[in-house]
């Protein structure tokens, strides 16, 4: 979806005028599994990156951005400015990621 909609972390798009439509967001929550927890437990003893969790968070960020873009497109937006991420744990075994920003419509 991001190939059809401009998503930027900046407030302004150079040489582009636009009107603000409003806030948009995309959220996903994924649960950890027993095998990931076992691997994480071992890594916490010896140290190092927990690749299964890194992969899960990367996938979650991608899903959140795609959902953000779907919501913006449904509002007729051409772009999303000031995009940010937030994440957190839920009940110790779930990870939630939200992408949020401001949907805008280009003015000719």
UniProtKB/Swiss-Prot annotation:
Record-linked InterPro entries: UPF0145_dom_sf, UPF0145_YbjQ-like
Assigned protein family: Belongs to the UPF0145 family.
Record-given protein name: UPF0145 protein LGAS_1099
């Amino acid at each position: 979806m991001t190939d059809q909609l401009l998503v930027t972390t900046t407030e302004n798009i150079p040489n582009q005028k636009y009107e603000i439509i409003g806030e948009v967001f995309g959220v996903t929550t994924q649960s950890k599994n027993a095998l990931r927890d076992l691997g994480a437990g071992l890594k916490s003893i010896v140290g190092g990156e927990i690749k299964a969790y890194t992969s899960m968070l990367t996938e979650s960020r991608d899903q959140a951005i795609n959902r953000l873009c779907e919501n913006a497109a449904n509002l007729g937006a051409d772009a999303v400015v000031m995009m940010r991420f937030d994440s957190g744990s839920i009940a110790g075994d779930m990870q939630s990621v939200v992408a949020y920003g401001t949907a805008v419509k280009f003015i000719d």
